Amino acid sequence: MAFFHDHRLHPDDPRREGVLNRYSENLKDTFDALTESNVPVLVGSVVVNERDCPPLGSLHPFGMSDDARSDFDAIWNQALNAEARDDLISAINFLKKAMEIDARFAKLHFRLARLYERTEDLTSSRFHYRQAKDCDALPFRASSAINVTLKQAVESVASTSIHFVDLESYLRNHPSSMNQVPGGAFFYEHVHFRFNGDYTMASYLFPHIQQILNLPRMEPGEESVRLLELVDCAKELGYNPVLEAMMIQSMIQLQKGPPF
């Protein structure tokens, strides 16, 4: 992790495009091999914590002048001061002014998302949460481009055995996602699911698995009866408060080191 912290990538770094291209090629090769072996496949979009995980890295563009950096920092501090005195509109306006200097600075978008959320402009808030993720200079969270590439790879394969499941859209529209932004209700930190997150994903995938394997199914309206409730599922798996505390402790230890 410390290595990555010293090798951050600006969101417009051309190497990112190279990674996406190789990712797409690898996906298609994998799908071809699975299709030849008659293996049914479910491919889910990648879900990450947008709301409750600030960007792990923010970078100004290479070659940004010292004057521009100085102007950006001055406006940034004005925004922080405005927010500190609860002048949210002024804070937003200062940050929008800073965006005119650098519109790809990740933590600027995250702060804007929080401010817009507090002023109940939820459309703008959602936009900037996503921008904060996509501009993260330490992209441990899957970007929007990753999921677009994933879906396009599935659509490019001429096979009825490869199925795409839009887990991201499902989680965005889940009642536990505040303002349609996945967050701490499902994740410990940037990507690792809480038990509730695992349960939510598994419950949504269940009927898709039945379908792709041609398993017998009840009527759609009755299908949910077969699913255990969260508490009962935890009991069957032996997941208890002690294990939950151990998970939380391990996540606390994880976040004491880089890149956090």
Predicted feature locations:
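Serine-dependent acyl-ester chemistry module
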Residues: 1-152, 170-177, 182-184, 207, ...
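Accessory beta->alpha helical hairpin/"wing" motif in late/C-terminal subdomains of nucleic-acid enzymes
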Residues: 193-196
